[in-house]
């Protein structure tokens, strides 16, 4: 049974733009979202998507223009600063640039929230020592931020955010300034925070691999709206929106990069297609179930008489379950390949890069603009074309003719 700890109900946040002819900019546009207690919840989007504004609504650093925000069972939308204080004390926050006091030691930085809340000195000392040990910085207690690495600074930031025993931890691009190895270490620490203390974590990020590593659920934002949300594995395995598919492309190791696709087109004359492989059934965002995929590729190849070559691939793990991407070259009469791909696409996410003669633009292919059903309905000549491109390729070629 779900236990909501944060709820957005038709939330809108607007800002007045500066300069002549000032207009109203809508940073958050009719967002309804529930985050359950104990979750690690990822909110992902490109710059300007509205994700940072959304997280600032959680601790009322911004107030909604309309709609309601409920945190820890309390509607905070119009609370006074005095009434907000006890709620904010239960919310910790870590930042991309760490926000440490350069003139305070590690221990003093961690103790700062306790000093603001007027805790006794003996409790402050005990709590700081506990947190130093938890984040692995006991030997650095008397160092200053300038003497620390980026990863160590973020560990101090996490310890400081935990000082007052919060129930919610907001992480706004907390790993964006870190190298991949340090990012993995910091994410592992955040996972420990969640597992050992039961703290709900809200991850704001533009990096899908961050969500992949530790989040349980995810919401994808674009232009102020939540365009897709759900279980992380389900979103990875069956992304529905173009922006989500672009994010997935950055995180799946088995998906070929654009330059690799170009090389494959130079080396192979047939249809270059990447198939997303799912290990288990998932719930589609349209309310229907999508079966595990990849098991029937060989059967369909035989059914349609399509020739295939396996060119590239890889397997990742999301929430302990495998998901992968395998790239093939498919050859055969155009309508055979089209019908084969349409049936395959019924339960698999198919990324069609077209042929060397008629390639599909990489961004269009990854965003999933191709629709095989629409292709057949709108292009009656496709069945007679020896190597018919996907619908997105036909549309792309037509648009540039």
Swiss-Prot record:
GO terms for cellular component: plasma membrane. It comes from the Bacteria. Keywords: Amino-acid transport, ATP-binding, Cell membrane, Membrane, Nucleotide-binding, Translocase, Transport. Disulfide bonds: none annotated. It is found in: Cell membrane. ATP binds at residues 45-52. GO terms for molecular function: ABC-type D-methionine transporter activity; ATP binding; ATP hydrolysis activity. Belongs to the ABC transporter superfamily. Methionine importer (TC 3.A.1.24) family. Part of the ABC transporter complex MetNIQ involved in methionine import. Responsible for energy coupling to the transport system. This is Methionine import ATP-binding protein MetN. It comes from Bifidobacterium longum (strain NCC 2705). The gene is metN.
């Amino acid at each position: 049974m779900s236990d909501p700890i944060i709820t957005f109900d038709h939330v809108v946040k607007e800002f007045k733009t500066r300069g002549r002819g000032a207009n109203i900019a809508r940073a958050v546009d009719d967002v309804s979202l529930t985050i359950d207690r104990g979750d690690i919840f990822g909110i992902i989007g490109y710059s300007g998507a509205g994700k940072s504004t959304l997280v600032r609504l959680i601790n009322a650093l911004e107030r909604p223009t309309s709609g309601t925000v409920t945190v820890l069972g309390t509607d905070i939308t119009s609370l006074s600063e005095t009434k907000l204080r006890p709620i904010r004390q239960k919310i910790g926050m870590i930042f991309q640039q760490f926000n440490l006091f350069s003139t305070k030691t590690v221990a003093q930085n961690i103790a700062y929230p306790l000093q603001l809340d007027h805790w006794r000195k003996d409790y402050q000392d005990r709590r700081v020592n506990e947190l130093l040990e938890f984040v692995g910085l006991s030997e650095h207690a008397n160092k200053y931020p300038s003497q620390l690495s980026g990863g160590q600074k973020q560990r101090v930031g996490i310890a400081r955010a935990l000082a007052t025993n919060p129930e919610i931890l907001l992480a706004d691009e907390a790993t964006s300034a870190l190298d991949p190895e340090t990012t993995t270490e910091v994410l592992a620490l955040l996972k420990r925070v969640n597992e050992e203390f039961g703290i709900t974590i809200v991850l704001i990020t533009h990096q899908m691999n961050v969500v992949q590593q530790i989040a349980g659920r995810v919401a994808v934002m674009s232009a102020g709206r939540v365009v897709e949300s759900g279980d992380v594995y389900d979103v990875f395995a069956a992304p529905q929106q173009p922006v989500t598919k672009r994010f997935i492309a950055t995180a799946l190791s088995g998906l070929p990069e654009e330059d690799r696709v170009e090389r494959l087109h130079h080396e192979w004359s047939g249809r270059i297609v990447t198939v997303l492989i799912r290990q288990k059934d998932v719930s589609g965002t349209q309310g229907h179930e999508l079966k595990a995929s990849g098991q029937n590729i060989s059967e369909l190849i035989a059914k349609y008489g399509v020739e295939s070559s396996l060119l590239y691939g890889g397997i990742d793990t999301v929430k302990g379950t495998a998901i992968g991407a395998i790239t093939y070259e498919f050859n055969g009469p155009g309508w055979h390949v089209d019908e084969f791909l349409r049936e395959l696409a019924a339960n698999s996410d198919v990324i069609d890069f077209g042929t060397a003669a008629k390639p599909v633009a990489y961004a269009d292919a990854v965003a999933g603009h191709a629709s095989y059903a629409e292709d057949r309905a709108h292009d009656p000549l496709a069945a007679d074309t020896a190597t018919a491109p996907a619908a997105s390729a036909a549309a792309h070629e037509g648009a540039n003719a």
